[in-house]
Amino acid sequence: MNKVSLLHEGKAKKVFLTDNSDLVIQEFKDDATAFNAKKKGSIQNKGVVNNAISCTLFTFLGENGIPTHYVEQLSDRDMLCKHLDIIKVEVVVRNVAAGSLVRRYGFKEGFVLETPIIELYLKDDDLDDPLMNESHAVALGLASYEELDRLKELAAAINTLLRSFFADRKLNLVDFKLEFGRHNGTILLGDEISPDTCRFWDLDSGEKMDKDRFRFDMGGVEDAYSEVQRRVLEL
């Protein structure tokens, strides 16, 4: 499968059209951004690590009944995917209070939520990806109420699967972001699942093992990403 032309370049990936109109190639970059690209940098080998993690997790989810855009891993940085009509709604699932949840509502960081919180955000960098509800999404023409119910249903199922998967690897899935798209009338999970899109804390030590290490200049970013990769791929 060959890259024909660049369809889109985002903060962490390039998406290429292929000679099959139904398929695209995602190329993972080493570029790193935080705070909606207000902070920029690079994490050595990040693209390779995130591609390997994402391919493994998409395979796992697909084997457990979650429809995804993943087709196959083409190389250390390239993933073959189904061509989606992206729904401009980011779905965030929170199991433990961290990040903006702490800032907005006054939770203590690390507070374990009795029930996971599912949030919707408008996918728009210029507006800083604002929090929104279903009525906003429908009014903006992004999705129907039925589609939004499906997004939340899938997000909850994915959370159940991934929490167990990561707990087996001594990682606490604190929260994570999902993106979805339409493909031939079906909603599929898209984008990636990696330390760029998830908060991971070591279950024993509580050490942060995700992009927060880049956001807040904690150091050890490459080591944390590589350790997550090692644990994801080890079993």
From Swiss-Prot:
UniProt GO MF annotations: ATP binding; phosphoribosylaminoimidazolesuccinocarboxamide synthase activity
Q: What EC number(s) is this enzyme filed under?
A: 6.3.2.6
- PROSITE patterns from the xrefs? SAICAR_SYNTHETASE_1, SAICAR_SYNTHETASE_2
Keyword annotations from UniProtKB, A to Z = ATP-binding, Ligase, Nucleotide-binding, Purine biosynthesis
Q: Name one GO biological process term.
A: cobalamin biosynthetic process
Regarding protein family, the annotation reads: Belongs to the SAICAR synthetase family.
Q: Which NCBIfam families does this one have?
A: purC
The identity of this protein, by name, is Phosphoribosylaminoimidazole-succinocarboxamide synthase
SUPFAM superfamilies from the entry?
A: SAICAR synthase-like
Q: Which residues form a coiled coil?
A: none
Q: In which pathway does it act?
A: Purine metabolism; IMP biosynthesis via de novo pathway; 5-amino-1-(5-phospho-D-ribosyl)imidazole-4-carboxamide from 5-amino-1-(5-phospho-D-ribosyl)imidazole-4-carboxylate: step 1/2
The record's catalysed reaction(s) read: 5-amino-1-(5-phospho-D-ribosyl)imidazole-4-carboxylate + L-aspartate + ATP = (2S)-2-[5-amino-1-(5-phospho-beta-D-ribosyl)imidazole-4-carboxamido]succinate + ADP + phosphate + 2 H(+)
> Is the keyword Protein biosynthesis assigned to this protein?
no
EC class of the enzyme, as a word: ligase
Is the Oxidoreductase keyword given for this protein? no
